[in-house]
Amino acid sequence: MNIKNYVVCDNILGIRTALKKIDWSFGQPSKTASEEEINQCRIVVRLTIDSLKDEAKKFENSQKYHYWLGDSGRDELFYQRNLFASSKLRLLLRGVKSGQPEIIINKNYLRFVIGRFINLHSIGCQLTDLACAMLLSRELCPLHCSSFSIDGSTVAVIAPGNTGKTLSTMRAVLHLGAFFISEDLAVTDGENIYACPWTSTFRYYDELSMSRLLRMRMKLIKIIPPLELIPMHGGDRKINAYIEDERILSKEKLTHTVILARRPGGVKVLDKEQALSMVLNLNRYEFMYMKSPMLTAYSYFNPEFDIFALEERERSILSKLVDNTTCLLVQSDDPTRFADMIIDGVKK
């Protein structure tokens, strides 16, 4: 098995896997990482493919938690469910308490479990939830934002989906001289922002496309939205296809938290309580570790793994973020204006 290393957030988060494509929220770098680079990460998640037939036998006498199997204090959790005929869906979680988290799934789970359906979550969702929990356990918080730095100021741009946060950062970087940090997701300790630059939701914007075919596809998506769900070769360009490596920053001290709203109103300063409420709401919409069946079942057998404590830590870190930055509400009916409005607001 050819295991490869990927660092998705420098010195913070990495993943080891043999899969060619990692379908999780933190993205996938264009290049693999060395052992030295992956070992510098505070958190390394491992994803492995195996039949898990031997593990199924080991858990035959374990306690049941719906389709999950575990034992009190055991740093392992097993999932098994009938698929069709004699085939099974299987997943094994282990290493959470030891700080070496690993998810092992069989090929059926990888192939047939897509998205979130009731309590059945894809491996990408499971990996994202696990990574979020591991980050929070180390006083770090995933942040659903885009981010850029310009003239000594570093901005986290937070907004509901499809409002314009990605477009704002990409316009600021490509047209207004800003340095890139993240376009959809980052990590924060409440003071600094750590880049997760390998997501690629910016590929859906016409002006950033690099081929006539891709531009045509983007226009069709606006007319027929379900086309977005159909994969297209060449639609996964990474950020360094658009921006030079030296203009991609990995860590900066945050100075501004900006929340976007698609409505008239211009720019105004938010009070800290209102800003925190909005940031928490938007972060909770994106990250669902609190509702993860896998983590919930694991915490049943390992109550010291307290999901509610992780939620409080998220609130504490984001409260620190709001207290440490100037918080702005930027409002416009035209999302292409957001970047200029943000920069003007930051300079005042």
Label each region the model flagged.
Residues 1-158, 175-176, 188-348:
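A noncatalytic interaction/capping subdomain that flanks phosphate/NTP-handling catalytic cores
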Residues 167-179:
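A conserved segment at the C-terminal end of the G1
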Residues 163-165:
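Conserved glycine(s) of the Walker
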